[in-house]
Amino acid sequence: MFRRLLIATVVGILAAFAVAGFRHAMLLLEWLFLNNDSGSLVNAATNLSPWRRLLTPALGGLAAGLLLMGWQKFTQQRPHAPTDYMEALQTDGQFDYAASLVKSLASLLVVTSGSAIGREGAMILLAALAASCFAQRFTPRQEWKLWIACGAAAGMAAAYRAPLAGSLFIAEVLFGTMMLASLGPVIISAVVALLVSNLINHSDALLYNVQLSVTVQARDYALIISTGVLAGLCGPLLLTLMNACHRGFVSLKLAPPCQLALGGLIVGLLSLFTPAVWGNGYSTVQSFLTAPPLLMIIAGIFLCKLCAVLASSGSGAPGGVFTPTLFIGLAIGMLYGRSLGLWFPDGEEITLLLGLTGMATLLAATTHAPIMSTLMICEMTGEYQLLPGLLIACVIASVISRTLHRDSIYRQHTAQHS
């Protein structure tokens, strides 16, 4: 057991450096090509001319598509192992290392050029990849899946600063595949990854800065639960839209470079209306949490961002969908909160409260992982007073969504982009 905990610590350290490496590569490319050193793609888009704002996501998609197509032709004659940690965990615990690195590089290109896709997906993949490399060299074959799971959880902890949520994501999503007894090493890896990531970044700040002064009362619990019901209905709708967009892009029968470029061009067109559509949505979420906008502004940005996410994901852009889902959930919750705020004196606090609730419940509705979703929002914001209400609402959202749509967003996205 001591040996496993020691290996889990090493895996956590490797995962933290893998995530940091991807993050610094992003910052370097943004500085080189966008002249942006703020770390915010929304700021980068704001400072670009309309033509560059329009074409940059398309060019990034084109470059990523050419890379993926070239690699596919180069390796046409050899057998392929999984390039995703979920696939590796469901098979024999082995990766196609070269293909996974190419996939991560393609993700780096589309993410830094403004596509509305999550950077965290590639970060988690690289963390799992680093864990797999170490495991295959120093551990017996029957443990390989455990260390990939530890790497994925550690990558999630380093990317989102949420070690418990990262650990429980692995447990909830892989329920039946991984024994609960294995959670010890997973948690150790996740916590170590967070600590090392904090040292690398010279910061232990929360992912999102929120000033929620409300004390949760009976009325608020009712609003939180009703938001869970709303998210439970919206989750399957989002999944259906994503699936329909993917089928639409596939039906065009375009070569991968053209398909990804088309997705990027749509994002570029939408960014002419609002630069907030660029990127995974992190900076927009933070700005909404700092000062919730008015109803019509939320609605406008929400519609543009939703279309950008659908275009990026549907075109096959390699990347994650968790963070874009967080923004969509925040916007749905805030739209609901703004509507209710007309009848309550503390409308601003209700909007913020239901925005956070929307983030958690839509994540639960799309991932079918209610405990992870609850803990993730609490860990990212530090608002642990919301935990009881969020847990109830997330379970309700997950049950409703699972009833209406069998597959989670992660399994659907993996099936489409693997």
From Swiss-Prot:
InterPro entries: Cl-channel_core (IPR014743), Cl-channel_volt-gated_ClcB (IPR023790), ClC (IPR001807), ClC-type_chloride_channel (IPR050368). It is a multi-pass membrane protein. It holds the Pfam family Voltage_CLC. The keyword Cell inner membrane applies. Keywords: Cell inner membrane, Cell membrane, Chloride, Chloride channel, Ion channel, Ion transport, Membrane, Transmembrane, Transmembrane helix, Transport, Voltage-gated channel. The chain crosses the membrane at residues 5-25, 54-74, 146-166, 168-188, 222-242, 260-280, 291-311, 316-336, 352-372, 380-400. The keyword Zinc does not apply. GO terms for cellular component: chloride channel complex; plasma membrane. SUPFAM superfamilies: Clc chloride channel. CDD domains: Voltage_gated_ClC. Its main location: membrane. One of its GO terms (biological process) is response to acidic pH. GO terms for molecular function: voltage-gated chloride channel activity. It is found in: Cell inner membrane. PANTHER family: CHLORIDE CHANNEL PROTEIN CLC-E. Belongs to the chloride channel (TC 2.A.49) family. ClcB subfamily. HAMAP family: CLC_ClcB (MF_01203). NCBIfam families: PRK01610.1 (NF002437). Probably acts as an electrical shunt for an outwardly-directed proton pump that is linked to amino acid decarboxylation, as part of the extreme acid resistance (XAR) response. This is Voltage-gated ClC-type chloride channel ClcB.
